């Protein structure tokens, strides 16, 4: 990353890879956030630095857990559900740190923003991972019931047809 310090942050953000690199699907990479923070003059701010380190740690732990799950030799437990929860949290934290670094530029349109709009795009996208593929609450229920062996939520829903359930 040291060879990119003189580049404009917008150039780096546009080329930032998306996906299983720890950026959380549509997140922003730590390298791109670092460059943006330097460009905006907030890299020396201890609050920004601590938030960026926490995001980096979350990304690394998620990456290690994915590697551990892949090496599980066909064993299936709650790894996929936990990875989904971790990814949702990673995208939420990417949004928070991106907006912390971007500051008031977060209100600007893509072409006017120092981030080139990637932080704004991530902000708009960030609720999606906690919804698609089963909400975070559903994932937690699956982990609790199937992995930890906890009892299911009590209620009439188990044997009752949907049409017969009480309406709000």
Identify the residue ranges that each predicted region occupies.
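Alpha-helical interface subdomain recognition
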Residues: 2-168
């Amino acid at each position: 990353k040291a060879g990119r310090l003189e580049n404009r942050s917008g150039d780096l953000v546009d080329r930032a890879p998306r996906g299983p690199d720890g950026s959380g699907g549509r997140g922003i990479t730590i390298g791109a956030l670092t460059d943006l923070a330097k460009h905006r003059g907030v890299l020396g701010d201890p609050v920004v630095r601590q938030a960026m380190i926490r995001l980096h740690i979350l990304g690394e732990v998620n990456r290690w857990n994915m590697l551990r799950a892949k090496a599980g030799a066909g064993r299936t437990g709650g790894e996929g559900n936990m990875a989904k929860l971790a990814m949702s949290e990673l995208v939420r934290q990417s949004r928070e740190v991106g907006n912390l670094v971007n500051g008031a530029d977060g209100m600007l349109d893509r072409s006017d923003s120092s981030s080139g709009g990637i932080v704004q795009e991530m902000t708009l996208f960030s609720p999606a991972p906690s919804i698609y593929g089963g909400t975070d609450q559903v994932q937690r229920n699956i982990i609790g019931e199937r992995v930890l062996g906890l009892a299911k939520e009590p209620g009439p829903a188990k044997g009752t047809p949907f049409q017969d359930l009480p309406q709000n």
